[in-house]
Swiss-Prot record:
Gene name of the record: N
Record flagged with keyword Transcription: yes
Functional summary from the UniProt entry: This N protein may have, like the lambda N protein, an antitermination activity.
Keywords associated with the record: Early protein, Transcription, Transcription regulation, Transcription termination
Lineage summary: Viruses, Duplodnaviria, Heunggongvirae, Uroviricota, Caudoviricetes
Species assigned in the record: Enterobacteria phage phi80 (Bacteriophage phi-80)
Name used for this protein in its record: Probable regulatory protein N
GO biological process terms held by the UniProt record: DNA-templated transcription termination
């Protein structure tokens, strides 16, 4: 029971962060890149890429928590996959539900 409470708290925290990031993504997408200097446009794109990567990781964590709480079914595979921001490549292994 206490583990379930911790999982629910983790989900709430992840959802709050997700909501914050969605708002940040909306603000970034409202910015017209043509009005920015090349450096500002590059920073805007990098910020958007990082937010998107965090959202992907967060969704996988939310799925794992949902499975552990009985809200979702296990996936067939939790294989690692590659995230990229245009410059860097990151291998991400989603957490397998317990």
């Amino acid at each position: 029971m206490i583990d379930d409470i911790k999982r629910i708290d983790s989900m709430i925290n992840a959802l709050r962060n997700m909501k914050q990031d969605i708002k940040r993504q909306q603000k970034l997408s409202e910015i017209n890149s043509l009005d920015l200097s090349p450096k500002q446009a590059q920073k805007r794109n990098a910020d958007a890429d990082w937010i998107a990567m965090e959202q992907i990781k967060r969704r996988h964590e939310l799925h794992a928590l949902s499975v552990e709480l009985g809200f979702a079914e296990r996936r067939e595979s939790y294989a690692p996959f590659e995230l990229t921001d245009g410059w860097h490549r990151f291998d991400h292994k989603p957490r397998e539900p317990q």
